[in-house]
Design a protein with these regions (language model features):
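Long, positively charged, glycine-interspersed low-complexity recognition regions
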Residues: 235, 239-293
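Acidic carboxylate-rich catalytic motifs and surrounding loops in phosphoryl-/glycosyl-chemistry enzymes
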Residues: 33-34, 230-232, 281-284
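GST-like fold's C-terminal all-alpha helical module
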Residues: 100-260
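Alpha-helical recognition domains of nuclear gene-regulatory proteins
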Residues: 21, 73, 212-215, 219, ...
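GST-like domain detector, emphasizing the conserved glutathione-binding G-site
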Residues: 1-172
Length: 293
């Protein structure tokens, strides 16, 4: 068997997305909360960003980075019984891309797609697989950038967010928790302002968040409970994971009040808690194909 550890922040939407995937599919893992300032829990690794997943099997430990890549690799591992994670990593090559800021960075261009060696699956190009990958990309490329400007919109909201998450986490009642709460809220309040400018958001950043949530529910449509049909697929889990970081905060209450997302959100939450995501085996693809035939 494998031992999986997830190193994460309570307040990070990429981390909640990864955690929701593991929970949705009943994958056992150890959840390790990293202090957002000191990060001593990650001193074993040269990589200092979260989420970070370590996979230990037969004495070998592999590090998986990037939330969407983690999800795709673990999903692909489950549906490819004869392939190990090291082999799968080779199927997700990194390439150098230049961002809008002119800076070069390493990116995995196919990270929103699953790998399969079976000929019938490898050649299938159907609307459901494409739709899932496109909305996973949307969650990473657009939706996630609306979270910090909304959660940390004012200093009061920033403090509310850190106060709540510190109380929920393992740093509650410690001096590390106090540092995280006060320094973290001040830092993120400032970062939220810069992100609003960087991503050219409306002066009232809530409006962009409302539009995004309604766009998502419109894409699902009235004929489906989830984008995955009767069960959440990886797009559902990704969008839910990003939004769930706002739970119990003012921004979350406003979203439920001003958009149509409430019904989908709580059905997805229940499915994740019940390990009710689409089964990651060959039946998974049968379900996808059946929706387009």
């Amino acid at each position: 068997g494998m031992t999986i550890k997830l190193y994460q922040y309570q307040t990070c939407p990429f981390c909640t997305k990864t955690r929701c995937f593991l929970l949705a599919h009943g994958i056992p893992f150890e959840n390790i909360e990293v202090h957002p300032i000191f990060k001593k829990e990650m001193k074993f690794s040269k990589y200092k960003k979260v989420p970070l997943v370590t996979v230990e099997k037969n004495g070998e430990v592999l590090e998986l980075r990037d939330s969407s890549l983690i999800i795709s690799i673990l999903s692909s591992y489950i549906i490819n019984e004869g392939m190990n994670i090291t082999e799968l990593l080779k199927r997700y090559p990194t390439t150098t891309v230049v961002g809008e800021d002119g800076k070069s960075k390493q990116e995995t261009l196919n990270k929103h797609w699953l790998i399969s060696d079976e000929a019938d699956l490898a050649t299938v190009e159907n609307d459901a697989r494409k739709e899932e990958a496109e909305w996973r990309f949307w969650a990473d490329d657009y939706l996630v950038h609306l979270i910090s400007p909304n959660v940390y919109r004012t200093y009061r909201e920033a403090y509310q967010a850190f106060d709540y998450h510190v109380k929920q986490g393992r740093f509650n009642g410690t001096w590390e928790g106090v540092v995280a709460k006060y320094l973290g809220s001040i830092a993120m309040w400032g970062i939220a302002k810069r992100l609003k400018t960087k991503y050219k958001l409306d002066e009232n950043v809530r409006l962009d968040l409302y539009k995004a949530c309604n766009k998502w529910t419109e894409a699902i449509g009235k004929g489906r409970t989830f984008m995955g049909g009767s069960k959440p697929n990886l797009a559902d889990v990704s969008v839910f994971g990003v939004l769930s970081v706002m739970e119990n905060l003012d921004s979350f209450h406003d979203v439920l009040t001003h958009t149509n997302i409430k019904k989908w959100y709580y059905k997805t939450k229940q499915a994740i808690e019940d390990h009710g995501g689409q089964t990651l085996n060959h039946k998974y693809y049968d379900q996808l194909v059946s929706k387009t035939c």
